[in-house]
Regions:
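Generic low-complexity segments that are intrinsically disordered, proline-rich and/or Lys/Arg-biased
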Residues: 4, 78, 110, 252, ...
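Active-site-proximal segments of metallohydrolase catalytic domains
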Residues: 37-181
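Structured segments of extracytoplasmic/periplasmic soluble domains
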Residues: 19-23, 32-36, 104, 108, ...
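Fold-level signature of zinc-dependent metallopeptidase catalytic domains
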Residues: 1-19, 85-86
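Extracytoplasmic/secreted proteins, especially bacterial periplasmic and envelope-associated proteins
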Residues: 19, 93-100, 104, 201, ...
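Extracellular hydrolytic enzyme modules, especially secreted metalloproteases
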Residues: 139-141, 145-266
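N-terminal nucleotide-binding beta1-loop-alpha1 segment
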Residues: 8, 32, 46
Length: 266
């Protein structure tokens, strides 16, 4: 979260989001992402978790597991990270927010980073084995303390961060950590890829951004040409990530193309 927008004083109202909770504590995200039995919605209903979504879509052949950590406080106001570039309209310093979160994560004694380094997604040693540690955190998901800019940004408006999947430009070493690979990053862990989601995220946006981290592209009109979207709500990688009476809580399936891609690649 931010010095001027705390996770437990986030200024959210019903005008900003349908996913309004009294508390967005780490336990909320643990259930949202990794529960086998769903998580509690804002009206007390049971909603599908990201884990359940991936299990259902894969016929129980793929699942996700992890740990929700934090919250960690950024060093600068929210607008420093989410303010838009005058030339590209992209968030100015979202990557810096991720780096700051990683630096604090590295000092968190409750986190065993070895649990999150089981893949060698870029085959750094060239041995053809992608199922081995490489010293890099496999799938990093960061949540920020505002509504996403794609949904209006809440009190931050255009200074909010737009949900996305990207990388840090270069590997970011987590100083003070210790990995099992002394020849990489000085024997410390590092991070490269990440996704970032809003405080009020439902499973739809989480599963969508995680889909990008697995290699899937967007299936909507990313150039906003106005020509329409043939896929639309038929895929979570398009408008389907917003499906549900409460937007994003009942994401639609992966498209047949996306399922074919995932079947071949993971």
């Amino acid at each position: 979260d931010f010095p001027d927008l705390n996770w437990d004083d986030n200024k959210l109202t019903e005008e900003h989001t349908q996913m309004l909770y009294e508390s967005y504590n780490p336990e909320h995200y643990q259930e949202l992402l990794f529960s086998n039995s769903g998580y509690t919605g804002p009206n007390g209903e049971n909603l599908i978790s990201m884990r359940q979504y991936y299990q259902s879509e894969s016929g129980d052949s793929y699942s996700v597991a992890g740990q929700a950590a934090g919250w960690y406080r950024a060093s600068k106001p929210a607008s420093f990270y989410g303010g838009n570039s005058p030339t590209t309209d992209n968030d100015l310093n979202a990557q810096e927010l991720v780096r700051e979160a990683l630096n604090q994560l590295a000092q968190d004694p409750s986190i065993n980073l070895a649990d999150y380094d089981i893949e060698d997604r870029y085959d750094y040693d060239g041995d053809g084995n992608f199922r081995e540690p490489d010293g890099v955190i496999d799938h990093l998901m960061v949540f920020h303390a505002s509504v996403g800019e794609e949904a209006g940004g809440g009190v931050l408006g255009p200074d909010a961060i737009w949900s996305h999947r990207f990388n840090l430009g270069r590997t970011h070493v987590l100083e003070g950590t210790s990995s099992s690979l002394p020849d990489r990053f000085g024997g410390q862990y590092a991070a490269f890829d990440y996704t970032i989601q809003p405080i009020d995220a439902a499973a739809g946006v989480c599963a969508h951004e995680y889909g990008h981290d697995l290699g899937l592209p967007d299936e909507y009109d990313t150039q906003y040409t106005g020509k329409g979207e043939p896929v639309s709500y038929w895929s979570i990688m398009s408008s389907g990530s917003w499906a549900g009476q409460i937007g994003g809580t009942q994401p639609t399936a992966f498209s047949s193309w996306a399922k074919h891609f995932l079947q071949k690649s993971i």
